[in-house]
Amino acid sequence: MEEERSNERFVLLAIMFSLVFAVIIVQLVNLQIINGKENDENSQQRLVQDREIVASRGIIADTNGIPIATNRVGYTVQIAKTGLKTPEVNEMIIKLIKIFESNGDSYESGLFDYLTFNPIAYGKRINNSDKALEKWKTDIVNKEADVKLLNTPEDVFKYFRDKKFEIDKKYTDEEAYKIMCIRYDMLIKGYTASNPLRIAKDVDTKTVAQIEERSHEFPGVLIDMEPQRRYVEASDFAHVLGYIGLLSEEEYAAKKSSGYKLNEKIGKMGIEKAAENYLRGINGKKRVEVDTSGRLTAELDSEPAIPGNDVYLTINSRLQKVAMESLQRNIEEIKSKADYKKNFGDANSGAVVAMDVNNGEILAMASYPTYDPAVYLAGADDKEAEKKKEEYRNDDKNTPMVNRAVQGVYTPGSIYKPITAIAALEEGVITPDTEYYDRGYDTIGGMKFYCLEYRNHQGPHYKEKLTEALATSCNMYFHDFGVKTGIDKIDKWAKLFGLGEPTGIELGEAKGIRANKETKKAKRNDDWRPADTAQSAIGQFDNGFTPVQLANYVSILANGGKKYTPHLIKQVKKYDGSIVMEAKPEYETIPVKKETIAAIREGMVAVSNSAEGTAATTFKDFPFTVAAKTGTPETGNEAKGSSSNALFIAYAPANDPKIAVAVVVEHGVWGNNTAPIARDVLKEYFGLNSNTYTDDQIAIEEVKFTH
């Protein structure tokens, strides 16, 4: 009986096992034979991703539409998150970097600014700030207690290698640092399967080919195309153009609400910064299907990117190049004539601003020394570019990154004398025919002042009227009538003409400073004295103005009292050609009499057209009349072996003004040393380099004086 029951159980179990096995066989047949192909395809897991289409930045062009900043297409390398383990990610990164390096490509990383290698040290963003260093260390640690372990850069390096990124001992320290660079960006900027991280831009086609050929080694690595910024004739336009760069953490915090991402680029200086809202495009999107390795299998749909707006400047490219070339050439020439008495061979920098007197358009804006903005487009691991940037940053003597045209503040010297004359004329202190007898010296407020020619043993100017005083730049004339006019009235007119006041130009500008009672009290905590007025009246003492203010000032002299807002942006257009913005000339009318302007014009014409004029040599045989003024302000360091600065202002044609020019050369020795620079600019503007000029460019007879 028991044996029969046992046999029954055995048969039952056998039947059950047979049924289970049969089910398995049926399923296998179904999976592998009947639906094998379909199931094989489904086994390749598919992901749907939303990928960004990067919009091209708007171009920047000159007034004639000649591009200065444009774009080209370049390949980028991105990493999307996959299921790779940490050791596999690290190995993949080092393989990618080796490909980059073999083809001369650079890769991106924010770590360069915080931790460097060879030597291992803190980067430029934290090496001079204990507060920034502590904040950074707190942000990067896994546990708060770990901060106490990070006392040196070497500690941070070890922490990153061993704890944070678990980098295998088989890698050298240099290889480990390279892995850290990419892993750091993965950590800080974040990346997911649907939001890949860009690790390299504008890579060589060889890099693209090698990555694609070995795609099985690089799961999640994507190749895409993005517009890359390109600068044309970059050094000539550097200070106007500026450059773009990756968002800093501070910029990102301020801009993320506007849709910016941490790995985006933004205008950092110049028009790139000033016109950021115009130039930035709107990124598009595409929905794609990818396999588990991140390879694209299908593009489902897309929303195209909208390019940024194109910005057209008031700058004329040819005029800009002439201004830059002439500025550099004349600085070298001044330097070469060192006599180590007055000229100490230290001329090294300067600026030129040319302005349309009838609408405020800036026609040229040159600042020297210049820099190459293209180096700021390179990757952070581009050693040559980083070296160049470091040179620019550390050049405290020449400061090439400073736009002297809007940020340089210079004592004006004698180019200020027309303002003193305007104040004296408008306030009824003098007429154009009021005579001053220059005996070579005078005592004002207990201080003795000398005529420059008298001091140089050439004899004083004797009797002079306004025209002669401007032509010969007689200090004694302006000392005397400046004191009689008074500092308050002189300062009032200087302010009306925009000196020591922001001009409103699009670029970041210095305000400058005017010599007056308030300024002296604030700077020196001292009362004003008559001798202070005497010095201020000839453009010395606390007076300090930017070249763009000086160009604006001479423009007002030229057009008879219209103070325009200087501007660099002429027009903004959409990619389809429709106009987004068009500059409309704005001006304030200065309440100055026509007779006053005429008297100043006569004196400034005499500067360039009389035998005794301080710029007569430069404009001898010039085919039309130029109204001008030279300035040789003292810096206070002449006794220490430093040359005086040199300044020059002009407008032309004097009888029908079109253009105003202001020139500054630091340590340029004499004001008339800068006149050839203005002459070159005027020649180019009026087409004289091709020996063509129009009927309104008519020469006048030489002005002659009688004493």
Model-found features: residue ranges?
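Membrane-proximal periplasmic segments of bacterial cell-envelope enzymes
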Residues: 1-305, 329-351, 357, 370
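Extracytoplasmic/secreted cell-surface and envelope-processing proteins
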Residues: 87-88, 232, 374, 478-479, ...
